[in-house]
């Protein structure tokens, strides 16, 4: 079962699929496609350093939040259109299924923004301008860690100044600027909340329920693919991969690996967890095996376990 935060987020994605619209600009058909999804899972337990794990993936997170979040509703140089990316952040810790989840974009606003420019005779150029402007203003704020709020007055001023030479109509520009500010404010506030949450929780978790975190992502992916089978989904696991629930627990990584070949055990656990929705999606394991202390051989076995779990090439 999902918690209510996940359920609301997934209902929103389903709604975005229903609301996807085909619109025309510059004589060509433009489609705001349903959203794609980037999932990030960060380990808060003390078997690895949460700060190091977050630093390892943060550049990729920022790229997801800025360069991919508006999508591309037009075909460009023969490349197909694609939907906006929804970035979701969850955690490994004690009872991972019940830890907080952050959805970092208000992607429904992207549809609304597209509606504002879709009837423009230069819709594709307008969308490219909005996308580049959004990226250039949002990225420095996120690189700074979302350490300070982004006041509405400053947001409106920045976007208006950047767009006034391209969108000469005052009312049109005001409507676009308002929507862009809603999106930027939402993302900066959520990102700041994410950074603060990591700082608060990183020393609070002595156990690491990796399987619980993966099962929760699997449920979310399953729901997305049900509504949009063509969705591009990416999962990044920023964890050392050690599942530790309690002393002598049968699902501890050490107990599992003691039962036989690490690769075979990974394949067996994949079937037991019914994680089939994760088969075939893009999975990255930047922190797997990064255990603290003198555990090189054990870390290597954990790395092997997870690569076989996800059927990844070496």
What are these regions (language model features)?
Residues 242-302:
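VWA/integrin I-like adhesion module and closely mimicked acidic/polar interface patches used
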Residues 2-13:
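Bacterial N-terminal signal peptides that target proteins for export
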Residues 34-178, 234-236:
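Von Willebrand factor
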Residues 206-226, 261-269:
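A Trp-anchored, charged/polar loop motif used as the substrate-binding/catalytic surface
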Residues 192-211, 251-258:
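Surface-exposed cleft-lining segments at the edges of enzyme active sites
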Residues 22-25:
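C-terminal motif of bacterial Sec signal peptides marking the signal peptidase cleavage site
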Residues 34-51, 192-201, 283-289:
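Acidic/histidine-rich, surface-exposed loop or edge segments in extracytoplasmic proteins
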Residues 27-29:
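Bacterial signal peptide processing site
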């Amino acid at each position: 079962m999902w918690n209510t935060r996940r359920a609301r987020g997934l209902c929103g994605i389903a709604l975005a699929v229903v609301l996807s619209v085909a619109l025309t600009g510059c004589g060509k058909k433009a489609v705001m496609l349903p959203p794609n999804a980037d999932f990030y899972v960060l380990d808060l337990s003390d078997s690895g350093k949460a700060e190091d794990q977050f630093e390892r993936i943060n550049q990729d997170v920022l790229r997801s939040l800025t360069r991919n979040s508006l999508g591309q509703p037009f075909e460009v140089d023969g490349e197909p259109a694609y939907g906006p990316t929804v970035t979701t952040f969850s955690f490994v810790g004690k009872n991972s299924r019940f830890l907080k989840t952050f959805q970092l974009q208000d992607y429904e606003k992207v549809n609304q923004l597209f509606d504002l420019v879709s009837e423009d005779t230069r819709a594709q150029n307008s969308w490219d301008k909005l996308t580049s402007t959004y990226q250039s203003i949002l990225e420095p704020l996120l690189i700074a860690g979302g350490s300070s709020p982004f006041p509405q007055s400053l947001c409106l001023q920045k976007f208006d100044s950047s767009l006034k030479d391209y969108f000469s109509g005052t009312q049109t520009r005001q409507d676009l600027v308002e929507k862009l500010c809603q999106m930027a404010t939402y993302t900066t506030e959520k990102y700041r909340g994410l950074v603060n949450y990591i700082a608060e929780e990183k020393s609070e978790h002595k156990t690491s329920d990796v399987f619980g975190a993966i099962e929760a992502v699997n449920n979310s992916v399953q729901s997305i693919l049900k509504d949009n089978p063509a969705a591009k989904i990416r999962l990044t696991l920023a964890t050392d991969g050690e599942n530790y629930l309690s002393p002598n627990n049968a699902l501890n990584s050490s107990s599992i690996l003691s039962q036989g070949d690490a690769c075979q055990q990974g394949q067996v656990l994949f079937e037991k967890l019914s994680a089939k929705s994760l088969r075939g999606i893009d999975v990255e394991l930047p922190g797997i095996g990064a255990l603290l202390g003198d555990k090189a051989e054990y870390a290597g076995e954990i790395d092997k376990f997870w690569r076989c779990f996800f059927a990844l090439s070496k």
